Amino acid sequence: MCIRDRSLCTSLNHVVCHGIPSDRILIEGDAINIDVTAIVNKYYGDTSRMFTVGDVSVKAKNLIDATYESMMKAIKILKPGIKLGDVGFEIQSYIEDKGFSVVRDFCGHGISNIFHEPPNVLHYGKKNTGVELKPGMTFTIEPMINAGKLDVKVLNDGWTAVTKDKSLSAQFEHTVGITENSYEIFTESVKEYRKPPYN
């Protein structure tokens, strides 16, 4: 999701999501999420990933790695018959074991020829709860993970969300579909460019 006359969102360091591109110069140690949307034959694809500028702290690297792994762990369990609570549980349990926190204020979403539609895809939850997955469903999985507490606030621009404690935040996002027996990732990159860091 983008804003105003911008074509993407850029969420830097403690910005959780919906960061507005600016003329701020990136410096060594920055971590930035770039979130883009494509429209192909009237259908939407939504994806984001983390990039780092030069050397980053060990904590930032660990946060970025854990965020990516939590998304992929959730994706790998997708198939008809499981429930969205299973997806959230997979992310939450992995992240909290790493000592990080899962943002509750934002979630993934159904997506097709409408950008945001049901169901909401929470990145926390209990097993065997929520909507049951069926073939043909398409949605995003996009965990937002904080190095500190889960609390966020929206800035005065009414758009940019940041961590309340100013801790680092990271996010990855894929658009996925449920097939007859498994899943498909629609926003996957070429073979050599799947896993971070993309610096």
Regions found by a protein language model. Give the residues of each.
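Active-site neighborhoods and metal-handling regions in enzymes and metal-associated proteins
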Residues: 1-199
